[in-house]
């Protein structure tokens, strides 16, 4: 059976049958099907033509329906949503339905249309004029009387939900005005009709690198996320994606989502089209409607931000649309935990997400402090073992196996963990990765200001724009603005490396080069990232410098563990010194030794 084309007038198409109208070809397709409708094709053609919208007769009319969070405008052509705008708490108005000035009402696929797929009606009702049946502050109702041979009355009711300002309740009623019963849907696999949303979700975040739109649906307590970039029309059925037996389906961008939920059993959904312009529809299963009876099916439509509290209040399970990581569930849970803490700081301490980020950084640094202290001690112990390690290298030469064995014995004897200094950095990597996603895609940070020039924590902190663009690797789109936070972050990292203990009295040239280039490389990588992430890294680096300054690590010689070697000599312990001061003292001692060696050398030559 061939799905109907969207054309319902006498327009001809450029194909081998171009001499015949689209409706005539649709009629032939239905005659050849196994279960055609029991109506006369000629009468159906006349009835559809009578429904067609003619702008010359009267222009389309628009009707508004508003809530505290939504501004909706409906057109009487198709009884569809012409404009849908979400009102954000900061006063911003974000349209989710694009405007198309100059385009006739019946030529654009506006959302919330009806489709009778393998019926003579097809989507003809979307190009037909409906009558305004009733209107109040929060409810609007459209109706259409179908002439012979269809004999039906269809009513579409739109109402703002009383318990949620971002939820639109939709009811579609089909009244059979025939003298006998009728079946909507040609066979068991055929839907009665479908309520559609198209085209896509236009939420103004298309420039966001992580704003790839997704189809999300819930099937038997399992959520599926499907990137719309993978949509591909299947030649066997014309669909791009079929989603059987689901509870709800959603189209999600980075910050906004449109979700449709069926309030009846046996719902399914499908998607048609290409990634740039696709249509998603919720299907009503095949039903028999007795003479004079009415079939009513209810839907809920959520139009709003991808924000946990708003999604959770809409209906159970919709909050699962919020997902930062689709492949690693533990990272998604961790990222949501970070967002929860940030929201708590915002709601409980100060209503500024910039300060919430600073508080989170302090919390993470405090939690990591014991490991940081242990890591610093481990690095200092490694520093003091450097002479003995050099001695082992000289003794074993090129025998790597023997050298590794001797090194491990030395570590064990002196109680040193060679990886201890790396643990704090490794443990912070999940935090960094999680916050990278949170700051770039969480709705809470969209347009959230901090101080001064930082007006959007989800975007780079452009102090001013450059009159040119510099193509720099690892910066995505190059450098076209002066972003201050990553520069300050790089300077703070340079200062931090100056305070880090080295692995020996004289730093390895490769290590020195790495320590010099790392701040520069990191600043370049983070240059065009969200300012919220750069604020976190800058604050963490500064706190690390403060920690290093006040942490005093004992400068005593490392003694073997009791029972492994001689016991430490008794006596007064040397006064603990900051490891940076101790390193500087050692450098001064080495310089003095070099000067003494030079003097001895000159004295020896004089005697000769």
Locations of regions flagged by a protein language model:
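Membrane-protein biogenesis/insertion across secretory and organellar systems
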Residues: 1-362, 366, 560-608
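Hydrophobic alpha-helical transmembrane segments in multi-pass membrane proteins
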Residues: 356, 369, 373, 417-437
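Residue-level signal for the membrane-embedded core of alpha-helical transmembrane segments
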Residues: 358, 426, 430-433, 521, ...
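Terminal, Lys/Arg-rich, intrinsically disordered segments and adjacent short helical elements
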Residues: 1-45, 208, 373-420, 467-476, ...
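Residue-level recognition of pore/gate-forming positions within transmembrane alpha-helices
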Residues: 361, 365, 425, 540-541
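Hydrophobic alpha-helical segments of integral membrane proteins
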Residues: 330-349, 385, 407, 453-454, ...
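Conserved catalytic motifs of ABC-family nucleotide-binding domains
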Residues: 434-494
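Membrane-interface starts of transmembrane alpha-helices
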Residues: 349-356, 360, 480-485, 511-514
């Amino acid at each position: 059976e061939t799905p109907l084309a969207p054309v319902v007038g006498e327009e001809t198409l450029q194909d081998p049958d171009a001499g015949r109208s689209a409706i005539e070809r649709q009629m032939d397709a239905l005659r050849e099907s196994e279960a055609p409708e029991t109506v006369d094709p000629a009468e159906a053609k006349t009835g559809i033509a009578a429904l067609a919208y003619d702008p010359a007769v009267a222009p389309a009319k628009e009707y508004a329906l508003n809530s505290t969070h939504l501004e909706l405008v409906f057109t009487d052509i198709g009884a569809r949503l012409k404009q849908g705008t979400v009102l954000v708490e900061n006063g911003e108005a974000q349209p989710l339905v694009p405007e198309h000035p100059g385009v006739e009402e019946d030529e654009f696929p506006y959302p919330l249309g009806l489709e009778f797929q393998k019926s003579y009606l097809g989507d003809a009702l979307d190009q037909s004029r409906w009558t305004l049946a009733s209107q109040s502050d929060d409810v609007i109702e459209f109706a259409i009387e179908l002439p012979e041979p269809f004999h039906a009355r269809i009513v579409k009711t739109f109402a703002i939900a009383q318990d949620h300002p971002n939820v639109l309740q939709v009811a579609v009623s089909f009244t059979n005005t025939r003298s006998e019963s009728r079946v909507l849907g040609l066979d068991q696999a055929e839907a009665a009709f479908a309520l559609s949303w198209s085209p896509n979700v236009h939420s103004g975040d298309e420039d966001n690198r992580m704003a790839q739109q997704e189809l999300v649906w819930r099937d038997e307590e399992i959520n599926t996320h499907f990137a719309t970039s993978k949509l591909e029309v299947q030649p066997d059925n014309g669909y791009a994606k079929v989603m059987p037996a689901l509870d709800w389906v959603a189209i999600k961008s980075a910050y906004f989502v449109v979700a449709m939920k069926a309030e009846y059993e046996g719902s399914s959904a499908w998607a048609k089209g290409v990634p740039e312009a696709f249509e998603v529809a919720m299907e009503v299963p095949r039903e028999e409607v007795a003479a004079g009876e009415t079939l009513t099916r209810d839907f809920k439509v959520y139009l709003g931000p991808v924000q946990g509290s708003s999604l959770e209040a809409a209906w159970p399970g919709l909050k699962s649309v919020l997902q930062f990581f689709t492949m690693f569930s533990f990272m998604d849970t961790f990222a949501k935990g970070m967002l929860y803490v940030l929201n708590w700081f915002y709601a409980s301490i100060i209503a500024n997400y910039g300060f919430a980020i600073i508080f989170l950084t302090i919390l993470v640094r405090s939690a990591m402090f014991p490991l940081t202290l242990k890591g610093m001690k481990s690095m200092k112990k490694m520093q003091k073992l450097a002479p003995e390690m050099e001695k082992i290298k000289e003794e074993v030469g090129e025998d790597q196996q023997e050298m590794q064995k001797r090194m491990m014995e030395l570590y064990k004897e002196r109680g040193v963990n060679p990886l201890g200094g790396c643990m704090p950095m490794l443990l912070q990597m999940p935090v960094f990765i999680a916050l990278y996603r949170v700051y770039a895609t969480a709705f809470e940070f969209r347009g959230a200001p901090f101080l001064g020039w930082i007006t959007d924590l989800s975007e780079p902190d452009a102090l001013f724009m450059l009159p040119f663009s510099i193509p720099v690797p690892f910066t995505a789109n190059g450098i076209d603005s002066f972003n201050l936070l990553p520069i300050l972050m790089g300077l703070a990292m340079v200062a931090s490396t100056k305070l880090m203990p080295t692995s020996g009295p004289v730093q390895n040239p490769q290590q020195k080069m790495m320590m010099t280039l790392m701040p520069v490389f990191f600043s370049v990588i983070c240059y065009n990232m969200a300012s919220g992430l750069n604020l976190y890294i800058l604050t963490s680096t500064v706190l690390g410098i403060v920690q290093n300054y006040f942490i005093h690590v004992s400068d005593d010689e490392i003694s073997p563990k009791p029972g492994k070697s001689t016991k430490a000599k008794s006596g007064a312990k040397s006064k603990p010194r900051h490891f940076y001061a101790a390193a500087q003292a050692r450098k001064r001692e080495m310089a003095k030794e070099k000067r003494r060696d030079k003097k001895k050398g000159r004295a020896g030559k004089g005697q000769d």
